[in-house]
Amino acid sequence: MRTIEKIIRRLGYHNSEKLFYLSDIDKCVDLSWHDRRVLRELAPYAAYIVDGSVLTVFFDDLNDRPDVDLHGKIWNAQMPIVISDEGNYVKIYNGKSMDLGIEKKIRLRDIISYDLSQCDEENEFSYWNVTNSLSLDLYERSMCKKNLNEFLIDNLRYITKKLKDEFKISFANKLMLRVLFIRYLIDRGVNIGYMGLGDNVKQSQEIFLSIIQNKNDFWALVKYLKERFNGNLFEIDEEKEDAEITDASLVVLHDFLTAKEEMRTGQLCLFPFYDFNIIPIELISNIYEILLGKEKQNRDKAFYTPEYLVDYIVNRTVGNYLIKENECKVLDPSCGSGIFLVKSLQKILEHNAESNGFLKDKEKINKLVEENIYGVDYNEEAVDVTIFSLYVTLFDYQDPKSLEDFRLPLLKNKNILYGDFFDEENMKAIEKIDYKFILGNPPWGSVNQHNYKKYCDDRNVIAQDGEISVAFLLKVQEIGDVDTECSLILPSKILYKGKSPSVALRKRLLTNTQLEQVLELSAVRKQIFKGAIAPAAVLSFQCQKSALNHKVEYISLKPNKYLKLFGVIMIEPDDVKYVKQTLFLENDDLWKILVYGGYWDFELLSIMRNKFKSIRDVVIEHKLILKKGLQDSDGSKDASHLTGRKILDSDKAIDHFYFNDNAYSMLNKLTIRRTVIPEIYQAPYVLFKKGLDCTDYTIRAVYTEKDFLYRETINCIKGSEADKKILLNLCGLLNSSLFSYFNLMLGSSAGIEREQIFLKELEDYPYAYSDELVELVQTMQQSETIEEKEELQKNLNQCVLRMYGLQDNSFVDYVLSTQIPLLCGTYQEKKCDVKMMKEYASIFSKIWDEHFGQSGVYYTIAIYPDIKGKFAAIRIKLSFDDSVDNIYVVDNINEDVSLLADFMVYQLNDCFYQAKNVVEFSEDSFVIVKSIEAKNWHPAMAIKDSYKVLNAVLLGKGDC
């Protein structure tokens, strides 16, 4: 047996159905043709492939192919983990990170080396641990600050900007697209057949570098490519381009392509090391979406879409549809660089390809794009990039050795329109087409364009804050018919804003469409949208079809390491809920509750509101004033009655139970932008910051009897001396952990964007009173040591929970102990232990007894606290014997092959991107298997799981 095979077996990969040896790569139907082609070129001994992505590759000759730059090729392929047999030891490399050696060659970054004896199933890179977030620290530490994508972005941004700014080349983007296209043809081994550019890749790369230094030679090559392949990319405005291109600019371009040009940013220029035969073209497309630049983003409010998010959307729409069909018409109404269209075209071409992944029929391949792919963009450079990306995609599905008769289709202003989506005259051509899918990431925010505003006005729709995405959301419904599914990335704020235009928009959506899925991304916004932390959601719906009893799949992603390290969307079981559409219509709060909670939280909050007064009720009853402070920026409002008074420093004056009366300045203006009734500056009052404490989402509030002015970033609840206890009680509530739960469940901003509290929302929170809380607040405000404050805060939190009868509520505890720390980045991952699992089992037992205690059927619960360091399980075995132990622990089953098979741990481990809990039934027992992370075995999960199993048993289902 070869040593590499021993390594695979010792690490546990050999039992997985997702391990593919090189000769079997084509049997992996989840893998794209591009990735299969890349794997065949890299020729690893084997690859571990999960959900269509290569996660781990195994080599026993990584450094033994002198004629092949394997390190460079693997880095271009961005394969995360490389396990290499290197004779006396086993070395692990990070395939997404590299160092540039002295000899100017790419070398993958070393992670660690092992003796063969150290390769076992407990190893950090074993089959069980490469998908275990508790075991990824070594890999995480080996990551470069930048991956290939980011290097390529920096490189292309640098040269494009230099050509535009220093050499005044207005078509610099298009020039670089041509360069990239030619490099792609060369790297693919296409015999261009001009000036020595043949199928010898290295030789052709050198010839192209020579051509690029001579303007006449370069133009001659572009004209030749236009004549040979047709297409919009090679159309030349000779007079303009000849005037703008200079010999000096071509020298700079040549030096950039050879890495001789030193980038002023100090970043590495890696262009000679890129292999465009391996780099997916959708990456180039996506990069150019970024390169269109801040100017486009600021003007058109268009932000780039991460590739893995596009994959998710296209797979669940176009991909699923093509399981039974051959093609489908797709529109992206704001196509940007065309990544949605490229991914959709790839699906169509793959479905129509022959067994080798290519399409021989040149007419058919053009027909597939001309009859199925449509896009619009307001930016002409974006249209050019889209067409470039589609052209390269067409080449990607053809044998580079048989392109003699191939002519690219002309797509500009036929399929891919340059113009305003809301210019009804110009859009008539594409509006008559029967689309199966409308996909995209439309611009967000208020844009200086007229047509979309008129479009909304004509339909009596108010786009709150001038939000252009609202207009896109409406128009795609008009273009689509009952068979059209739309899937759009939208600012999630439109789902939570409480003002009437947003409420009306949600009702309109729920009434006029069948909502298929909501993918909520707010919790992972900083991981997904780099440089733009606006919260997003993907809304997928059927046009012109209302179905209020239809169940909506609601998914709210949570932060996880896989998104950061592997660039994949991981959906955990608790992220998914199924909700009747009518419930959203009847309960507008449900949109926000579901982001971090579920049905149990919805029920709990409904009970709280019915059982307790609201803060609004207390404000009215005691004639309190609830207001925010003044705006002291320049304005015309008379402030002479406030001039010369102390105004608090919003940042330094207030914290939890803390008031710094020395943190102030003097108001010296006679007029300001906005004043407020002067009574609110007269103590006593509770002052609290508008911005939440981002470490735990609590409100920073303090009671004081000192008079001050304060700005709008500080709110107040003002009363009289007779209201002191009420104010102290309110101060305690605002600072409590329970109110951070309310903030996350009911506040439109908390956990979404900017983390603020709005007074209109706060007024609706449930209110309770306790003299114990009042005393705690008084003590808290006088305490001085950190230790004393921490102990008092714990007591205060428990006191408030008791006031609401929630001291033992598992769902509130889950949000406070897990959801909020996850969101705030303070959560410490850990494994569950026997004590935790016994508590889980006892809750399960209690609920089971409530339903079946008198049935004469008894049961035992076996606890398996650690299976392969990755999973834990409980098995409930039914019996008519009441003498057996009710709950017991089984310590080690790692070598019990039949039990591992019964528990389906291999199948579970191979589906980690869409993690599932296994609930498997047999004749007299059932088993629950989940990841070993403590959060999955929390008491709240025990309650949820118990009722899932009960439903399955009572409804006669074999699974749940």
Model-derived features with residue positions:
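Nucleic acid-processing catalytic cores of prokaryotic defense/repair systems
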Residues: 1-112
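C-terminal substrate-recognition regions of SAM-dependent nucleic acid methyltransferases
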Residues: 138-172, 176-192, 203, 308, ...
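Preference for the N-terminal adenyl/adenosyl cofactor-binding alpha/beta module
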Residues: 86, 113-345, 349, 372, ...
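Non-catalytic DNA-recognition/assembly elements of restriction-modification systems
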Residues: 590-632, 652, 769-960
